[in-house]
């Protein structure tokens, strides 16, 4: 009954991944991001991750697999997803939703830490403000974006962009794969002397 729709969805996902893989700069950006994160951890730094909606879930997934585990047992790595409901509701109420991530960055981060901002459109005002706060603290910034990068284009030390202009779920599918690869590479970097 739905076989054609299922095949169509899976083929579109495969095409989106194939298009992403065609650009070697994407592979290079993933490698550079993993090394940047591992170097921060080795120097006593941490990563804060943030996003909205499905990207918020990706930010939490990223932090959880760093502090918990990915495929193998190993020490936890310092990662925090900005997801504390009391913080989010307080700042939303008192300052506005655009400040929910930047206030946390201002309070918790320091030079040497890394911010991972995830936005399929690249236009999330609260992530843009978090990037600005991170820059003011002397932090490094990695972004996972889509389409043309939106307003976040060019704002990060490393941008990993999925150049897909259709529905956001296709971009999110690549983002979660990138997140898993980042963790795998971080684990390899962390065991190096």
UniProtKB/Swiss-Prot annotation:
Keywords: Carbohydrate metabolism, Cytoplasm, Isomerase, Lipopolysaccharide biosynthesis, Metal-binding, Zinc. It comes from the Bacteria. Residues 37-193 form the SIS domain. Substrate binds at residues 52-54, 65, 93-94, 119-121, 124, 172. Zn(2+) binds at residues 61, 65, 172, 180. Binds 1 zinc ion per subunit. It is found in: Cytoplasm. One of its GO terms (biological process) is lipopolysaccharide core region biosynthetic process. PANTHER family: PHOSPHOHEPTOSE ISOMERASE, SEDOHEPTULOSE 7-PHOSPHATE ISOMERASE / DNAA INITIATOR-ASSOCIATING FACTOR FOR REPLICATION INITIATION. Homotetramer. Catalyzes the isomerization of sedoheptulose 7-phosphate in D-glycero-D-manno-heptose 7-phosphate. This is Phosphoheptose isomerase. It comes from Yersinia pestis.
């Amino acid at each position: 009954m739905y076989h054609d729709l299922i095949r169509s969805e899976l083929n579109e996902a495969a095409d989106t991944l194939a298009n992403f893989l065609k650009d070697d700069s994407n592979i290079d950006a993933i490698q550079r991001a993993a090394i940047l994160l591992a170097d921060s951890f080795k120097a006593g730094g941490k990563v804060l991750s943030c996003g909205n909606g499905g990207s918020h879930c990706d930010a939490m997934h990223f932090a959880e697999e760093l502090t918990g585990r990915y495929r193998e047992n190993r020490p936890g790595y310092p990662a925090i997803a900005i997801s504390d409901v009391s913080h989010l509701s307080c700042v939303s109420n008192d300052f506005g939703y655009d400040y929910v991530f930047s206030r946390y960055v201002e309070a918790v981060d320091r030079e040497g830490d890394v911010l991972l901002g995830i936005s399929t459109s690249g236009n999330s005002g609260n992530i843009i403000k978090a990037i600005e706060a991170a820059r003011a603290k002397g932090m490094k910034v990695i972004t996972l974006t889509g389409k043309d990068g939106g307003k976040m284009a060019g704002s990060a030390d490393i941008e990993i962009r999925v150049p897909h202009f259709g529905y956001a779920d296709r971009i999110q599918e690549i983002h979660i794969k990138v997140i898993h690869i980042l963790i795998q590479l971080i684990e390899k970097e962390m065991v190096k002397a």
